[in-house]
Amino acid sequence: MTQQRPPLEIRLCGPRGFCAGVDRAIQIVVLALKKYGAPVYVRHEIVHNRYVVEGLQARGAIFVEELDEIPAAHRNQPVVFSAHGVPKSVPADAEAKNLFYLDATCPLVSKVHKQAMRHQRLGRHVILIGHSGHPEVIGTMGQLPDGAVTLIETVEDAHTCHFDDEDNLGFVTQTTLSVDDTAGIIKELQARFPNLAAPAAESICYATTNRQDAVRAAAPGCDLFLIVGAPNSSNSKRLVEVAEKAGARMSMLVQRAEDIEWEQIGDISVVGLSAGASAPEIIVDEIIDAFKARFDVKIELAETTVETENFLVNREIRDVELTVKDMAFVNGEHRVVGISKLMQGK
């Protein structure tokens, strides 16, 4: 006699997973491999997700941390800069080495770079709200001369920082931060420095905000909230924090279904599920299947908005057709519409 499986409601958040910037970055590597052949070099992880990196490695991408790691014999092969952005010194170094590069920096990160440079042009010292050591922060700070940017990570930092000219300050933020935590830091800075100039547009990206809003709406009443993402993914870790603050009894970050500690979970009847902006939909499917093997699952879509954004790839590779099959290693059978939209605006 087959044992009856306990009932389980999965609140599947929407939006979740890949944002337009991550989609674009992965597509740039895939299209470069199709056009130029392997190897294609990628400086730093193209996005912070092990599954994506390994999938691209299997297709011929080689990941390096510095351009000096590219062998002289392969200097005619393209190198792709990651979605997080790079300091100005990196493309300058590539040009000095006569390397052909494709910049996969997310357009919204590039917007933050421009905001920081605008502050400086107007004579302001730049305050960057972000996490020390994150590639995006390194890239943003590297747009300006040494000493032109001060990094603020916490409300305490905002409370204790000092500047020579407190009347000429401007701030920008890392795109993947918690909206709530950032608001507290900005409030403290504005209280101390009334003339603090804000960026012309919001720095935190739409996808970060949308994913946090969806998790915040779904979390109340959840016994467990799972976020699919990598330990070094800033936006994924923020989603775990949002779920806890919004009322989930327990929340955790997992990279694959095999990471779920079933014994630790205990008795559950409602599970929230979302994915960071660099986590592929195929892993979400994998986790749902793992629950279906143990529970009688009912899926409820917890959708707060629908995203329609798409970013064009670099002009040099727009002549290459991108197919559903090309992206199946991360998308499975999902999100095929974005591929047809990608080639618009050649």
From Swiss-Prot:
It comes from the Bacteria. It catalyses: isopentenyl diphosphate + 2 oxidized [2Fe-2S]-[ferredoxin] + H2O = (2E)-4-hydroxy-3-methylbut-2-enyl diphosphate + 2 reduced [2Fe-2S]-[ferredoxin] + 2 H(+); dimethylallyl diphosphate + 2 oxidized [2Fe-2S]-[ferredoxin] + H2O = (2E)-4-hydroxy-3-methylbut-2-enyl diphosphate + 2 reduced [2Fe-2S]-[ferredoxin] + 2 H(+). GO terms for molecular function: 4 iron, 4 sulfur cluster binding; 4-hydroxy-3-methylbut-2-enyl diphosphate reductase activity; metal ion binding. One of its GO terms (biological process) is dimethylallyl diphosphate biosynthetic process. Isopentenyl diphosphate binds at residues 48, 84, 134, 233-235, 278. Transmembrane segments: none annotated. Dimethylallyl diphosphate binds at residues 48, 84, 134, 233-235, 278. Binds 1 [4Fe-4S] cluster per subunit. The active site is at 136 (proton donor). Keywords: 4Fe-4S, Iron, Iron-sulfur, Isoprene biosynthesis, Metal-binding, Oxidoreductase. (2E)-4-hydroxy-3-methylbut-2-enyl diphosphate binds at residues 48, 84, 134, 175, 233-235, 278. Pathway: Isoprenoid biosynthesis; dimethylallyl diphosphate biosynthesis; dimethylallyl diphosphate from (2E)-4-hydroxy-3-methylbutenyl diphosphate: step 1/1; Isoprenoid biosynthesis; isopentenyl diphosphate biosynthesis via DXP pathway; isopentenyl diphosphate from 1-deoxy-D-xylulose 5-phosphate: step 6/6. [4Fe-4S] cluster binds at residues 19, 106, 205. Belongs to the IspH family. Catalyzes the conversion of 1-hydroxy-2-methyl-2-(E)-butenyl 4-diphosphate (HMBPP) into a mixture of isopentenyl diphosphate (IPP) and dimethylallyl diphosphate (DMAPP). Acts in the terminal step of the DOXP/MEP pathway for isoprenoid precursor biosynthesis. This is 4-hydroxy-3-methylbut-2-enyl diphosphate reductase. It comes from Brucella abortus (strain S19). The gene is ispH.
